[in-house]
Amino acid sequence: MTPLTLMNLMIMTLSYIIPILIAVAFLTLVERKILSYMQARKGPNIVGPFGLLQPIADGVKLFIKEPIRPSTSSPFLFIMTPILALLLALTIWIPLPLPFPMADLNLGLLFLLAMSSLTVYSLLWSGWASNSKYALIGALRAVAQTISYEVTLAIILLSTIMLSGNYTLSTLSITQEPIYLIFSSWPLAMMWYISTLAETNRAPFDLTEGESELVSGFNVEYAAGPFALFFLAEYANIMLMNTLTITLFLNPSFLNLPSELFSITLATKVLLLSSSFLWVRASYPRFRYDQLMHLLWKNFLPLTLALCLWHTSMPISYAGLPPA
């Protein structure tokens, strides 16, 4: 590989990663503002105009603090897991069309599913490496919850693949030009939305960091820079799941819109969907753990399996009919 090719690759990678990190930083500000207005208070409004520089101030503060490591923790894993979490959270964005993917993979949806499954390891190892009972319980809960809800996510993805006919995400744009998939498969979209809430450990499914019982969950022993990396990874995953939801069910490709507006439309829809995540957080109390698991294994799984069979069998059964 020539130095020029290597430099081009680095510039492409940075131009892909930096906007995501900036969006993640300002999503934290949006969250604090929305929650504060829902609770009849102002939220951050001191640092910069209307508190717009608050995420930058928070980031600088966290990264210049001294990173404290518990004496009984595993030194290598304790430092490596936050880096792994952020690395995976940024790698998953590669096949997403925004409007063009960084790598147009044939099996883009499978890549997304595989990479999101790997994030479980960063949670589990961080809880184990901390050598704290609260962190370990939080990590085990996170792993059980994430692995469980990935089952329904995979089946729903399979159903959408049946409708689009391809594993590449850009095909979904062509599929949804006449009508959004949310209209034809709204039960799948509703279950997908709730499963993404659980997959990203957001309220009311934030069992992993229940403050009243686990202090802060798997990241209880982390401070300063490593904590900031976990924080960035969590919010990057939230934005990724929302972008994927929009791509699957509310694709921003319009027949009459110029392609230059694709990114603006996508960003607006992702922001609105992220705001609904925050609305849910402000409105609902935390689920009990057994209710969380019953919701998936006793309600969502039978429904998604039935709908997957429906989406598989209907085109085949109608294919034999004569045209109207």
From Swiss-Prot:
Keyword DNA damage in the entry? The reply is no
- Organism name: Excalfactoria chinensis (Blue-breasted quail)
Which cysteines pair up through disulfides? They are: none
GO CC terms, sorted:
mitochondrial inner membrane
Query: HAMAP family in the record, alphabetically?
Result: NDH1_NuoH
Q: What is this protein called?
A: NADH-ubiquinone oxidoreductase chain 1
The EC number(s) given in the record are 7.1.1.2
Q: Which family does it belong to?
A: Belongs to the complex I subunit 1 family.
* Taxonomic superkingdom: Eukaryota
Tell me where in or outside the cell this protein is found: Mitochondrion inner membrane
The way it spans or sits in the membrane comes to:
Multi-pass membrane protein
Residues that span the membrane, as ranges = 10-30, 76-96, 107-127, 143-163, 178-198, 229-249, 260-280, 300-320
